[in-house]
Amino acid sequence: MTRLLCLAALALFTNHFSLITSSQAADRPNILWITSEDHSPNMGCYGDKFASTPNVDALAARGMLFRRAWSCAPVCAPARTTLISGLYPPSTGAEHMRSMVPLPVGFKMYPQFLREAGYYCSNNSKEDYNLAKPGQVWDESNGKAHWKNRTAGQPFFAIFNSTKSHESQIRTRPHIAVHDPAKVRVPAYHPDTPEVRQDWAQYYDKVSEVDADAGRHLKELTDAGLADDTIIFYYADHGSGMPRSKRWPCNSGLQVPVVVHFPAKWKHLAPPEYKAGGASDRLISFVDFAPTVLSLAGIQPPAWMQGHAFAGKFPAPMQPFIFGFRGRMDERIDCVRSATDGRYVYVRNFMPHLSQGQHVDYQFATPTTRVWFDLFKSGKATEAQSIFWRVPKAPEELYDLTTDPDEVKNLAASPQ
């Protein structure tokens, strides 16, 4: 009899716990992040008529895009340091590309907070955090990680990362261009040559490929009947993989596409300016993503996080500036800091004796870099194209994005 009573009590407790778990799951959104690599907001929804990105464009049409979003770092690993921690990498020791340092004692990566709150957290599959992981971070993190592997009814946080637009893919040959190289807009800092046009056209082709990947993930969510329960983010990890974008903390290296969608059920968690088909001028950067995802899950972001939640239960006030940085990039050291208010970009070069265009083997594998440098050496580059290679570089730079989106007219010495 005693055994039967114990079993009955256990069954009641289990049923009660199951009901609580189901209730909690119903009160918390699923969160899906679809990410890509090395691309700026060169997408149709951002007004780029040369781009072919129908899936992200459709997401933006029913959601909202951010026009002033920065990565913090113009290269992948430090950018991911920022994302996973909610901290600026210079404050953690992970500023340099391919670092491996621990977080301070007691600090955690944001998926650990989510898992403690009952979320199933999957990452498919790039990590590259520049940080030593403080224990188990994900429920699964590999090429098979998927929200489908969670317990039935469990809320999920899932990342799917596409590498198809990575810098290395811009220069892969042979490549049959889908986007016509003749129709490329070549930025003022690049020479207008067939090699440069080919690289830019191939870059746009690769952005179309990651858009197709995004479409597959969105369809999978819809087919599973989960679209109405899931908050979606689409973003890239930093600016384009073209030279003078990737690795440089100016707008071309830091500005990223960020598109979000909040279904009706979770619209109360959206930023106040959120509306279907809208565009926000709020300044956000990657340091804000960790506190934001915790806030969306109903978790108070820890005080040590340096970012500010822009949505969810614990929103912070809008910020007047966002910040970027550059440290060692592969085999070349540098020290640069940058800031923007959305219109002006200020850059402080602490090592002006080093040119912007220091020789990085990985970057010189891109045809654009080689032909650009050769034209500079032969004296055939324009003034705007020569700035990148000159020594010394200006200690301070100031650009007005409204009149100079390519950031080639330095206003730092202007009396105005």
Which residues make up each language-model segment?
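C-terminal helical cap and adjacent loop that interface with cofactors, partners, or active-site loops
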Residues: 402
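Formylglycine-dependent sulfatase
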Residues: 16, 22-397, 405-416
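Bacterial N-terminal signal peptides
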Residues: 5-18
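N-terminal secretory signal peptides that target proteins for export/translocation
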Residues: 1-2
